[in-house]
Each structure stands twice: as C-alpha cells, then as structure tokens.
A protein has these predicted regions:
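Carboxylate-rich, polar loop motifs that coordinate divalent cations or form catalytic acidic clusters
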Residues: 1-239
Length: 239
C-alpha cells in the first residue's frame, strides 16, 4: 500500500512488522497522482505519467517508462506475452517492451468528443485484454492489435447494462463480473453470449455503483460499492 509517500509491505504471518520503501522526492512531488500495481513479477509505482519498478531487495525505484502528457495519470499496469501494458486515465493505453520502450498505442473510446476515463485492465483465460472505460468495455486482442468496443444497447438484451464500466472480476466458473456506474451489476459469459443483470433491490445488491470485487477462500464474492458499503454474495446458497 501507499501511505505518507512510502510504499509499505506486510505479511499477515509476520505482523506487526512492516517494511517501508520511501519514495524519492521527484515521485512524491505535490500534484502528482500516485498509483501502486503489483504483478507476479514486479512491483510498479506510478507518479503522474512516470512508471517505476521497485527493487524490493535494495529499495530503489528504477524509471521504467514515461507515458502521456504533463497531466497524465496511470491507472493500471498488466504484463502479457512479454509486453507491459500501461493504462492511463485519459491518455490511452500504451504497450511497452520489457525494457519500457513504447511500441504500440491504443486510443480510448470517445465520450462527448473527448477521451473517456479508464479504470482498469483484465486479462482473460483466452488472452484477451479487457479495458474498463467510462464509455464502454474495450476488448483488445494483443497478437493482432484488433479491438472491439462493447456498449449498452437498449434494443439488444445481451449488451452491457451501462457504458460506464468501473470494475472487472473473473469468476471461477468461467464468467466475468462487470461493475458499472449506476447501471446494475453484470455477469458475462462469452461461451453462450449471455449477460445476466443484478440490480439494486431490497435484500440483494444495495447500490447500483459497483467499484471493486474480491473473492474469499470459500468462493464467496465481496462487492464494494460507491455509497452502499460492502455487499456479500454467498455462492453456495446463491444469496
């Protein structure tokens, strides 16, 4: 986690011990948005449009790549097929090689003639990258660089419930949970092109804005909302 301009790391087995990695002044300068992303291989720390890799043995931050303009904000980072994908809030998606050199750039969908805000990345079991944006769900095939934008369509029952996608979470049954801003919770299964909706109801989902998910060891789904607190879905009893 990031706290007081430091990255802090701890293990539940070794509490209350906390390891701190102080950020250099250029990373924590006023006005720069800080983002922390942990992959299987690296710990990434973003400051504005600058992306650093943290060496956990030495505590040093090494500049990996710089993307976007002066007001750029990095939202998420993903490693796929030897490439590193860097998602920004408003400046698009960048593909870098293992050394941080930018190779390809993918523009985000437009909303009201401006680039739509982006939220996060997800890599599915078929190798497709899902990009959550506030103007739809962008699907990217890394090998061919082809993209497809999924948007809400009132005339098509299996479309997204809302174009503003805030969160994506894989389900162990093979589907994908998609949280939207005010447009219900969606469960997508591309095997049968199905989309199930879960709207805010008494005794069910208590708020339509879903911002994050997490799954516990028993397979139950914890659903974080913007204004409705934390929801819990009992998978075994389907409630």
């Amino acid at each position: 986690l990031i706290r007081n301009n430091d990255i802090e790391s701890f293990s539940p087995e070794r509490l209350p011990a906390v390891t701190r990695f102080p950020m250099p002044p250029e990373m924590s300068a006023p006005g720069r948005t800080l983002t922390l992303v942990c992959t299987k291989e690296y710990v990434y720390a973003a400051s504005g449009g600058d992306l650093y890799r943290l060496n956990r043995e030495t505590g040093q931050y090494v500049l990996f790549a710089s993307v976007g303009g002066g007001s750029c904000v990095i939202r998420d980072v993903m490693e796929c097929n030897g490439s590193v994908y860097v998602l920004t809030l408003m400046d698009g998606l960048y593909e870098c090689d293992g050394n941080g050199r930018i190779g390809r750039y993918f523009r985000l969908p437009l909303e009201y003639e401006k680039s739509a805000g982006a939220k996060e990345l997800h890599l599915d079991s078929q190798g497709i990258i899902w990009v959550a944006t506030q103007s739809g769900l962008l699907l990217l095939e890394p090998l061919t660089a082809s993209t497809q934008l999924l948007r809400s369509d009132l005339h098509y029952p299996y479309s997204l419930p809302n174009n503003s996608v805030w969160s994506i979470f894989p389900d162990p049954d093979g589907g994908i949970w998609v949280g939207t801003y005010g447009g219900k919770l969606a469960y997508m299964t591309f095997a049968d092109n199905g989309v199930d909706y879960f709207k805010a109801t008494p005794g069910g989902l208590n708020h339509p804005i879903v911002s994050c998910f997490e799954e516990d060891d028993a397979g139950n789904l914890w659903i974080g909302t913007e204004g409705g607190g934390l929801n819990y879905w009992d998978r075994k009893n389907d409630r």
